Amino acid sequence: MRKLPLSSFGGLVVAVGLVACSGADSSPGSESSTAASQAMSEIQHGNPDSDARGVHWTREVHAARPGGKGGSPLMTNHGGKIMPTYVSKAIFWGTSWGSYSGDKMTGLDSLYTGHSNSNYAKTVDEYSGTNGFVGPSGVHQGHIVDTSAASGGGSTAAILAEVCKQVTAGNIVPDAGGNGYYPVYTDVPRGSAGYCAWHSAGSCNGVALQFAFFWNLDGDAGCDPQDTTTGHSQGLAALANVTGHELEEARSDPASPGAWYDSSGNENGDKCAWTFNVPSVTFSNGSQWKIQGEWSNAAYNNLTGYPNRSGQSGCIDGH
């Protein structure tokens, strides 16, 4: 879900805002107070603060949300940049990652590596911004393990601070063009929060970047794609599916003032969330993933997509 002004946190800057609309002018103090009240309300109800974009809601919450029928389902360009390419590096944050021996780290490295130049990555190629078209290629630089205690997903500033911590330590060198994407995988269970992941934008030391947050989804039915074919652990399969959602949204709608989303604020991943066309999609390195489709205006207009949960046939997965 697209949420879009700029709010500063010391040396950190996070893209902020509400669902795109033409609001009335207000005094800075009133605006700040309103934003703070909204953020606190969202955190108390298990939602991320209003800086988060592309929120991947759980199966149950997504099913209960308005389906978007009645108007045009097409996404439109709101005048911002896209990511013509990307550089990714994952952060595994939390005390339990130090002794972890499962398949999540190697699996997610494989997913990001194989995503580059895959047909799945090409599902976003039709979208353009002020800096050109989204391209299918990217470079994955592996991962970092930080065994300090992780925060949950209620505060985008806390997640950005973790990314900036790794920048300061020299573990991440942000892409100078603003095309760096740094997903943070925590060991914190979702609990009662109504979402599986989100992405946002900010800066570290004056360099713009994209980042994302993910809960530990082990045994989490609300965020489980129910993968029975790839051989991945349930926890990896759940993270892989929501990873596809967030990465493709970041590429087509990375930062203020925003690029591609529909009249309800839904980005390409939101519009096809929890819909799967085939049991698995093969990436460029041969790895296979049960992963949701992404919205394509072209597929919808040409009647070549498969239907989302609202019956709008604009989803594609490149299989």
Residue ranges and their predicted role:
Residues G17-A20:
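C-terminal motif of bacterial Sec signal peptides marking the signal peptidase cleavage site
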Residues S41-C164:
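N-terminal carbohydrate-binding/catalytic regions of secreted carbohydrate-active enzymes
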